[in-house]
């Protein structure tokens, strides 16, 4: 990563991100998305993967059928940064376009 990002307060980050939550054991954001079917979930992940490569910031995520669980943190900074907020906002937009329902449920 060429640019140094400063860690930000989780409450500030969460204020800009509806339905995202603080991870219970880490300095990270988390969210669960539910799609109509696997193809929609996989399409969402493919779109996010291209964006992640573009900004050189990659989510921790898992996919089970129509569900995608996401954790965002910036390892180099030891917590949440503007990169995570930017990724979360992009993910919310991409998920909405794919017809997803965002659920603020504990992921782990």
Swiss-Prot record:
It is an enzyme of class 4 (lyase). One of its GO terms (molecular function) is 4-alpha-hydroxytetrahydrobiopterin dehydratase activity. InterPro entries: PCD_sf, Pterin_deHydtase. CDD domains: PCD_DCoH_subfamily_b. Its EC number is 4.2.1.96. It catalyses: (4aS,6R)-4a-hydroxy-L-erythro-5,6,7,8-tetrahydrobiopterin = (6R)-L-erythro-6,7-dihydrobiopterin + H2O. It comes from the Bacteria. Keywords: Lyase. GO terms for biological process: tetrahydrobiopterin biosynthetic process. Belongs to the pterin-4-alpha-carbinolamine dehydratase family. This is Putative pterin-4-alpha-carbinolamine dehydratase. It comes from Bordetella avium (strain 197N). The lineage of its organism: Bacteria, Pseudomonadati, Pseudomonadota, Betaproteobacteria, Burkholderiales.
């Amino acid at each position: 990563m060429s640019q140094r990002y400063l860690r930000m307060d989780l409450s500030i980050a969460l204020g800009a991100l509806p339905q995202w939550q603080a991870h219970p054991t880490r300095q990270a954001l988390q969210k669960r998305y539910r799609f109509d079917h696997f193809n929609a979930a996989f399409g969402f992940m493919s779109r996010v993967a291209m964006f992640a490569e573009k900004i050189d910031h990659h989510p921790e995520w898992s996919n089970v059928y129509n569900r995608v669980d996401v954790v965002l943190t910036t390892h180099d900074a030891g917590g949440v940064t503007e990169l995570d907020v930017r990724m979360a906002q992009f993910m919310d937009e991409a998920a909405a376009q794919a017809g997803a329902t965002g659920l603020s449920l504990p992921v782990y």
